[in-house]
Amino acid sequence: MQPFHPLTRRSFLTTSGVALSTVALDAILARDAGAAEKYRGLAGLPHHAPKVKRVIYLYMSGGPSHLETFDYKPGLDKLDGKPMPESFTKGQPIAQLQGTKLKVQGHLAKFAKHGKSGQWVSDFLPYHAKMVDDIAIIRSMVTDQINHDPAHTMMNTGTAISGRPSMGSWVNYGLGSECDDLPGFVVMTSFAGRNPQPISQRMWDSGFLPGRFQGVEFNSTGDPVYYLRNPKGVSAAQQRDLVDVVGELDRHRNAVAKNSEVDTRISQYEMAFKMQASVPDLMDISKEPKDVLELYGAKPGDGSFASNCLTARRLLERGVRFVQLYHRDWDHHGDLVKYMHLCCGATDRATWALLTDLKRRGMLDDTLVIWGGEFGRTPMFQGKGGPGRDHHIKGFSMWLAGGGVKGGIGYGATDELGYHAAEDVVHVRDLHATVLHLLGIDHAKFGVKYQGLDMKLTGVEPSRVVKEILA
């Protein structure tokens, strides 16, 4: 076997047939080894003083029922089992119940008022009941898309058109990251329950923004990031040399090509190398004190939503700008009670623990927490096994908490059956405008030119900051 000869940048560049002048070669080699340009956001941002500097988005994929979580409607129980009044549904978009005889499904949970604020919360969410004074519940959300994939796309990118940047990518592009050895936008999906619907990686893609701003998915079990470990027999020093050489070649090529995606590739190689050291320590939650693990109900390596919530806090501590946690088991067309117990059992305590932990550490004051799915569920019965509910876009619930958000309030309302958002309607675009505002960004001024258009997260249709929920 031939002995290993250390790879040096000069020897590689001078013997590999790359045509570089002496001046160009010396200029490249004079760069600080492996120094990828640090990105700290766009000039001129933030537009105003931010209330928060980071976001954690708890995404309940599948469409949790507002009528079994936060939206109590006594009138629904009075009409239980009776035909759904046509005045509510005539001409309205309906998913799987289209063409069937519609009947009212009463609440499948018990509701009570909780906290000093007296907010209605169902008995599926006993830990949420403990924290209602910390959250602002929006009960008048609406969206445009009634099927999962386009609805996910709408909630994440502001449009149902595929290929647009996600909200996390927009934030990462605008403000940059405070962390040098982790991505600015991290996504995790919990491992739990039955066979949930998949989530497309488009939901955290950067679209027409440079690829360096896309979300990076960390695995909840096994290796956190695939292919992050060095091949057998390759040391960290050898890997460092290789990354340096590839970066130098890319920079030389890009001096001619001037392609922004080459810069992206350079930064991705550099970030991958740094993550080889940072990610294993980050993901090892066994180092957390026993009382913290017990608070979340987290078990190291189990891939649960609880473990992901704890990991999310660790990501925020290290300066990651935007963290998105998916829990994918909320599509309850039938057996709603059974599956609500499973979903809420997996997420309720962990969500409360996350807010509690952030408060204890003084982090909630400058962190925005978002909870919700892509749409809600119908007030009408759908039967697959036990009673369930179909997709619903005309009124559902989400909540926000953290810096700049009024805790202990409910905003907006649906009608007496929970069908239409009837008061203070909040569209997905309004939610996005509000998130950007809390980060110090004016949504109307934040965009990029693409294919001759001024592209924004909030699009061209009217949108507003929901100032009524802001502290």
Task: Describe each region flagged by the PLM.
Residues M1-A471:
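Ligand-binding pockets and gating/stacking loops
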